[in-house]
């Protein structure tokens, strides 16, 4: 009689755990800052869910049809895309891994004009991390490209507190 399909159509898949939005943003920050061409499937920029085929994704929703988590996800992802667009090292630069363990992945993207340090924390707990940057960098401060905050680098060492399931994108400066 079609009732099951009517139910599915009027009750689209939803995000069960709101921590999924933070995980999605962490993933998108990663793919937008590593080498290669980032691919974002439509709706990922808002955390849109899907179900099994043929209900992979519904029609795209905009503005007033988004919940607060989706609006914030879109805002945060847009900011990362803007950072990628305005910092060529994130698109074309060399890649140097500084740390890779079960919780933290940190790397620097460098070109002839700038160096950008990216730190992703996949753990749900805050992590204090310390990095010794290559001496050739000759940098003494870092600017957070998300918040605008500044960090001091002394003797090529930078210490950061990274919130749980978060990322930091820093421009290294002289």
Name each region found by the language model.
Residues 1-174:
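Active-site and adjacent substrate-binding regions of carbohydrate-active enzymes
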């Amino acid at each position: 009689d079609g009732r099951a399909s009517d139910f599915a159509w009027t009750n689209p898949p939803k995000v069960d755990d709101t921590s999924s939005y933070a995980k999605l943003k962490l993933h998108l920050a990663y793919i937008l800052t590593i080498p290669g061409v980032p691919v974002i499937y439509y709706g990922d920029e808002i955390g849109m869910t899907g179900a099994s085929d043929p209900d992979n994704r519904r029609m795209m929703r905009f503005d007033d049809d988004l919940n607060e988590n989706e609006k914030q996800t879109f805002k945060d992802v847009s900011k990362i895309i803007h950072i990628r667009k305005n910092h060529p090292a994130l698109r074309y630069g060399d890649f140097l891994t500084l740390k890779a363990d079960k919780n933290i992945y940190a790397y620097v993207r460098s070109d002839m004009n700038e160096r950008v340090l990216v730190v992703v924390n996949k753990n749900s707990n805050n992590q204090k991390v310390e990095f010794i940057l290559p001496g050739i960098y000759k940098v003494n401060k870092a600017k957070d490209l998300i918040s605008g905050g500044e960090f001091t680098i002394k003797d090529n060492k930078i210490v950061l507190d990274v919130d749980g399931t978060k990322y930091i994108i820093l421009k290294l400066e002289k």
